[in-house]
């Protein structure tokens, strides 16, 4: 009987799914389901830059290799086991440039 290990990407994806629902609503009004009113279905929130500005990002970005790299850097720098939301460790101008290329 062999053990099947989850890959790092699978583990990271599960962690991200958990915190997307848990952390995307800081400081915002929620509906009856607990989801933030201003975040459309199929999107999640990240916080970017020194000022931790809030951005709503489509879930489809999770498949992009550059975004996966940003998430890995976020996990290494901040971890995902906290109540602060997903913090992207890059300058806001760089994030906006990246996002404009893939959106």
From Swiss-Prot:
The keyword Oxidoreductase does not apply. Transmembrane segments: none annotated. It holds the Pfam family Auxin_inducible. Signal peptide: none annotated. Keywords: Auxin signaling pathway, Growth regulation. GO terms for biological process: auxin-activated signaling pathway. Effector of hormonal and environmental signals in plant growth. Involved in heliotropism. This is Auxin-responsive protein SAUR50. It comes from Helianthus annuus (Common sunflower). The lineage of its organism: Eukaryota, Viridiplantae, Streptophyta, Embryophyta, Tracheophyta.
């Amino acid at each position: 009987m062999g053990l099947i290990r989850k890959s790092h990407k699978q583990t990271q994806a599960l962690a991200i799914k958990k915190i997307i629902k848990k952390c995307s609503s800081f400081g915002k009004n929620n509906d009856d389901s607990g989801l933030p009113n201003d975040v459309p279905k199929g999107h999640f929130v990240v916080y970017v830059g020194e000022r931790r500005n809030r951005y709503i990002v489509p879930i489809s970005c999770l498949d992009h290799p550059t975004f996966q790299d940003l998430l890995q850097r976020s996990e290494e720098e901040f971890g995902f086991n906290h109540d602060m939301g997903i913090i992207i460790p890059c300058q806001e101008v760089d994030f906006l440039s990246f996002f404009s290329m893939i959106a």
